[in-house]
Amino acid sequence: LTALANGLSLGRIHHAYLFSGTRGVGKTSIARLLAKGLNCESGITATPCGVCDNCREIEQGRFVDLIEIDAASRTKVEDTRDLLDNVQYAPARGRFKVYLIDEVHMLSRHSFNALLKTLEEPPAHVKFLLATTDPQKLPVTILSRCLQFHL
C-alpha cells in the first residue's frame, strides 16, 4: 500500500487497479479510500481530508461519480455494456469518474471482453478499481492492464 500512496503523492495515477485478497481483508475499503484520494477537494492525495463534500459523499455511498457494482449479481454482458455506455461522459462533481467493480471475477467472458475494450483505451477522466477474492479467474488480458495489489 506504500506504493499506492507514493503513486498518488507523485501524481502517478494508473487507469485501473486490482485489489485481491480473502473476503473481509479490506479490498473495497481501500478502493473507496483511493476514490476519496482521487476526488478529494483538497487535490489528489494519499491522505484525503474526509471532511469536504466529495469525501463525505463517498463515505456515505452517495457520491455521483463513484459507481459501485457487485459483479456477482450483474454478470451479464448487457449489464457491463450498460455500465460502460456512460464512460465517455465527464464526471459530474469529482475530478475522476471511478468505477468500483467488486467480485470482478464473476463477470462472464463476454462481459470481460466488453470491459477490456474500455481498459485498452480508457478516457483520461475514468479510473477502474477492481476487487476480487479469486484473481486466477480473471483473463490475463484484464490482469495485464491493471496495477495489482494483493492484500
Language-model segments: what does each one mean?
Residues L1-F149:
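P-loop/Walker A NTP-binding region and its immediately flanking N-terminal helices
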